[in-house]
């Protein structure tokens, strides 16, 4: 079994150093159920775990996941169709800048690009590592983060990708920008990097890693799985054990935000400029409409208590979509994200 094919591998790779053997035992059954046999051929299905979603317009959207799965909707998420991708590698992240131009990244340095929203072609990666998140700020300028604290960049729509930044030998899980200059990248051990010049320079703002001289135990910051940027001053990051942090001063100070949620794993986050923040994870989904002062659990039909939410995207200024375990696609009902959410019937 190749556990690297499991969606949890991409989200929690490296967590054993701080979670320990007990946590890994709890995750074994999930890894086994999600594992794939190396080189095995498999027909793509509509119920593959989905790890990421992107809506460049209110109607047009794409989601990606295991076995090279890419789904497309042209009606705001009501119906979805599979798109051929030419790969069986797990696709961890997808992002579209408009209904034609999109990118998906994942296992073994996989980078896919479409210029018509229909057909996908491979782009050459300068590294063979796992690529965790892709974000484009224009149809030509984009970023990818992944293993070994690598940040890749392109200024020609992915015709050429270059290593823009690398630091410690950790995994960056996510990258997000609010414009073509201001962005953050986050990852293992609470590492946070910030740019205010479009990636020309990346500066570390938080994170630490050490090994105790007395016990030889690994010590480090809380793992961060996702970051969402509101404006040049404001950003949110989420991670292990229900950890949520926010900055309102461009990252000079990151403060923990209490949500009263159980210590579950928060894998994804999304936000808008109206003060709405959404957080999803292991059987958990939280929404704040007042910039984090209060948090509520929206009603899901069916309930997601036993499910996993891996990706959230905004599909309009007030409407959102979430994806996750077993091909789950959830849409917020109406203009208020606190209203009931429903799962799309595939």
Predicted regions: what is each one?
Residues 1-15:
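N-terminal secretory signal peptides that target proteins for export/translocation
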């Amino acid at each position: 079994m190749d556990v690297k094919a499991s969606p949890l591998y991409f989200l929690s790779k490296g967590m054993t150093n701080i979670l320990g053997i007990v946590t890994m035992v709890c995750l074994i059954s999930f890894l086994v159920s999600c594992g794939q046999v190396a080189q095995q051929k498999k027909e793509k299905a509509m119920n593959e775990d989905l790890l990421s979603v992107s809506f460049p317009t209110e109607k047009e959207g794409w989601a990606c996941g295991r076995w090279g799965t890419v789904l497309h909707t042209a009606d705001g998420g009501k119906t979805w169709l599979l798109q051929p991708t030419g790969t069986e590698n797990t696709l961890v992240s997808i992002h579209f800048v408009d209904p034609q131009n999109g990118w998906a990244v994942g296992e073994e340095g996989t980078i896919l690009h479409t210029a018509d929203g229909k057909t996908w072609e491979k782009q050459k990666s300068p590294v063979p590592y796992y690529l965790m998140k892709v974000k484009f700020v224009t149809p030509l300028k984009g970023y990818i983060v992944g293993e070994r604290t690598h940040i890749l960049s392109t200024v020609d729509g992915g015709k050429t990708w270059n290593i823009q930044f690398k630091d410690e030998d950790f995994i960056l899980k996510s990258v997000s920008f609010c414009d073509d200059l201001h962005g953050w990248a986050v990852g293992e051990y609470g590492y946070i990097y910030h740019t205010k010049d479009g990636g020309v320079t990346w500066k570390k703002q938080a994170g630490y890693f050490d090994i105790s001289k007395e016990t030889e135990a690994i010590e480090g910051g809380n793992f961060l799985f996702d970051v969402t940027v509101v404006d040049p001053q404001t950003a949110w990051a989420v991670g292990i054990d229900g950890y949520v942090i926010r900055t309102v001063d461009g990252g000079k100070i990151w403060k923990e935000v209490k949500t009263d949620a159980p210590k579950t794993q928060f894998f994804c986050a999304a936000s808008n400029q109206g003060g709405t923040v959404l957080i999803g994870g292991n059987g958990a989904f939280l929404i704040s409409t007042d910039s984090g002062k209060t948090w509520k659990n929206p009603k899901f039909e069916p309930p997601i208590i036993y499910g996993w939410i891996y990706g959230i995207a905004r599909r309009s200024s007030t409407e959102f979509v979430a994806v996750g375990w077993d091909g789950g696609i959830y849409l917020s009902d109406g203009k208020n994200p606190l209203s009931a959410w429903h799962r799309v019937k595939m």
